[in-house]
């Protein structure tokens, strides 16, 4: 099993990327980690080179580059070389914390989408109060979607939740402005009608965004514009909430500070619950092989989690199963 890694992509590359590999190596002894980038810089942070292949590259795609132009002009970039390795069969999957647009473009152009999938989608596992988490897609790969795109997303998300996260008959829901069947845009209503008739999907109907963190569904489907807005609202709320709680305690009386010290452990549990470090990266589902995007400011723990996520994807052959499923649907 080989995972190609863009070692130069991300805000803290290559340090956090390589340190994440060091952590993942301890648990994933059956994986060869291919690190693409500046070999000298990569070796500064490697514990050792067991199960490591370093592939020298001379270019880096940054967040300001136009994705399509960068893929075509920077062919020796760490990102393009890593994705190309998957295309050529030299690696089984790819991970990058670099430019989202460039990775999605490279995935589409090089790895290719599953033929019968109308639109691949960006999907991530987000936290819930019960600790189970939920998968939401699309998170921004597509800004506008048809009802049939949403139906494909539901199938992709359901297969991922069942095969990678081990959820039996995952509950699939559509984001809408009300739980009632009559609520939602024409696109959502059409998707609702189609999904309701599909026996292979455990479709539970509509869900409102206020109920997401309560664990009301295992897979949540929406268009890319809405999904990206919800994701950023959740991230922003979690950050502000923890900051304001800390500020209120520090600005309070001695009694308040003592109380804050007493609830330090529960607050730490809350912080861990809202953290995405252990959830892995955002998977670009609907492609012929796993392509995973880690957050640009990922910690080494987040990188290690993303690598373990990819390992599960490869072990369960979720991409292969999706290819087979959509081929059957096409007949």
Swiss-Prot record:
GO terms for molecular function: phosphate:acyl-[acyl carrier protein] acyltransferase activity. Pathway: Lipid metabolism; phospholipid metabolism. It comes from the Bacteria. GO terms for cellular component: cytoplasm. GO terms for biological process: fatty acid biosynthetic process; phospholipid biosynthetic process. Its EC number is 2.3.1.274. Transmembrane segments: none annotated. It is an enzyme of class 2 (transferase). It catalyses: a fatty acyl-[ACP] + phosphate = an acyl phosphate + holo-[ACP]. It is found in: Cytoplasm. Its main location: cytoplasm. Keywords: Cytoplasm, Lipid biosynthesis, Lipid metabolism, Phospholipid biosynthesis, Phospholipid metabolism, Transferase. It holds the Pfam family FA_synthesis. Catalyzes the reversible formation of acyl-phosphate (acyl-PO(4)) from acyl-[acyl-carrier-protein] (acyl-ACP). This enzyme utilizes acyl-ACP as fatty acyl donor, but not acyl-CoA. NCBIfam families: plsX. HAMAP family: PlsX (MF_00019). Belongs to the PlsX family. Homodimer. Probably interacts with PlsY. This is Phosphate acyltransferase. It comes from Lactococcus lactis subsp. lactis (strain IL1403). The lineage of its organism: Bacteria, Bacillati, Bacillota, Bacilli, Lactobacillales.
């Amino acid at each position: 099993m080989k995972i190609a890694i863009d070692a130069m992509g991300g805000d803290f590359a290559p340090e956090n990327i390589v340190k994440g590999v060091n952590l993942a190596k301890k648990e994933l002894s059956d994986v060869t980690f291919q690190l693409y980038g500046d070999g000298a810089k990569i070796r500064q942070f490697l514990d050792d080179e067991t199960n490591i292949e370093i592939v020298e590259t001379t270019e880096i795609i940054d967040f300001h580059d136009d994705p399509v132009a960068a893929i075509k002009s920077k062919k020796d970039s760490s990102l393009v070389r890593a994705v190309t390795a998957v295309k050529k069969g030299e690696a089984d999957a790819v991970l990058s914390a670099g430019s989202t647009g460039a990775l999605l473009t490279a995935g589409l152009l090089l790895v290719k989408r599953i033929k019968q999938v109308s639109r691949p989608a960006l999907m991530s596992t987000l936290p819930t109060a019960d600790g189970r988490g939920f998968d939401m897609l699309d998170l921004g790969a597509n800004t506008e979607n048809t009802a049939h795109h949403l139906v494909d997303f539901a199938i992709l998300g359901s297969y991922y939740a069942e095969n990678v996260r081990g959820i039996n008959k995952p509950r699939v829901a559509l984001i809408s402005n009300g739980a009632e069947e009559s609520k939602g845009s024409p696109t959502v209503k059409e998707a609702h009608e189609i999904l309701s008739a599909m026996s292979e999907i455990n479709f539970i109907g509509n869900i409102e965004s206020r109920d997401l963190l309560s664990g009301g569904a295992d897979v949540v489907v929406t268009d890319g514009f809405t999904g990206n807005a919800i994701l950023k609202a959740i991230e922003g709320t979690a950050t502000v909430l923890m900051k304001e709680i800390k500020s209120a305690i520090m600005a309070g009386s001695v009694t308040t500070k003592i109380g804050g010290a007493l609830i330090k452990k529960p607050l730490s549990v809350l912080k861990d619950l809202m953290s995405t470090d252990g959830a892995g990266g955002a998977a670009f589902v609907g492609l012929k092989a796993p392509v995973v995007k880690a957050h640009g400011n990922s910690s080494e723990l987040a990188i290690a989690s993303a690598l373990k996520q990819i390992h599960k994807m490869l072990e369960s052959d979720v991409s292969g199963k999706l290819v087979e499923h959509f081929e059957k649907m096409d007949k």
